[in-house]
Amino acid sequence: VAPRAVGPYEILSVIGRGGIGTVYRARHRESGQLAAVKVLGPAPAIEATAARRLAREFEVLRSLDHPNVVRVYEAGVSEGYSFLAMELVRGLDLRAYLSPALDREAPSPTSPREPSSAGGHTDPGTIPPVAVGPAAIRALAAMLDEPETAPEGCAPPESSPGIAPAPAQPASPETLEALNRPARLFRLRAALGQVADALAYVHGLGFVHRDLKPSNVMVDDDRRARLMDFGLVKLASERDESITLQGRVVGTYRYMSPEQAQGLPVDARSDLYSLGVILYELLAGVPPFCGPDAARLWQEILHARPPPLLSVNPGADPALVRIAERLLEKDPDRRFRRAEEIRAALAG
């Protein structure tokens, strides 16, 4: 049963539910400000010790202030519920924003500051307009765990030793042409560059996001990418156990680095690996690892090489392919060291 209120926030409606919490559309009782409130608990969904630690870690996140980072308003524990109140962003998640199907005339994303309105500013020569509908609002479920099922288009379990399964069905020439359109690649570079800026800022403060995936990046009506869902963020110097549920590695398997999948300590390079998974997926149309279940996926992340990107999409931008391949190195020491290096590589 949903709480009627959490802390100073009146619960209005459910945005989405996940394995460790629920996200609500809520209103601050005094200011009237709308927010997305992620609620963890009540016990026994999360241990009391972990809940208190979460509240302390979330409180630190209130200091985050960057144009490509969703604002964290406040956090706390209220009647057994740990909660995190964040800026309510309307728009498209990164995957939807870069969908080839959206390269057509349509309204621009909806601003969190203004209701939907007709038209919307467009710049046909640079970033094509994108459509917004109910799915855009549901994209706020980005703050939740995604199911670990094999994405459509991935191969069955059988594959060559040491190499993850290739797509079950090669993409059509039309699909590949759409993936490689200059306008789409322009906004891909722009969006990922902004994500790199956000990561550089977060990492510079000593944080690791730990759950970077396409649905945790929203693009608003200003074509501004916004990194969101800091429910799993931790200080790189602290132990992972602070926000790990019993018997479970927290995060979304498909985008985890090998070290995170093993429950080892992580640093900024783990987030950069996750960014590499995102880039591979956006270039190939499918993720690098397509395991049909968590166990198979775990094995692929730890031991398999992704199918060569140029074998999946021969027309992919070579410079972007090189960036993705370096980010996906199993050994963190062979990846980019800092998000600023990725921004420079994208600009080059």
Residue ranges and their predicted role:
Residues R27-A35:
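Conserved N-lobe loop of protein kinases adjacent to the ATP-binding glycine-rich P-loop
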Residues V208:
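Conserved catalytic-core element of eukaryotic-like protein kinases
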Residues R27, V70-Y73, M86-L102, L199-A200, ...:
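C-terminal lobe helix-coil module of Hanks-type protein kinase domains
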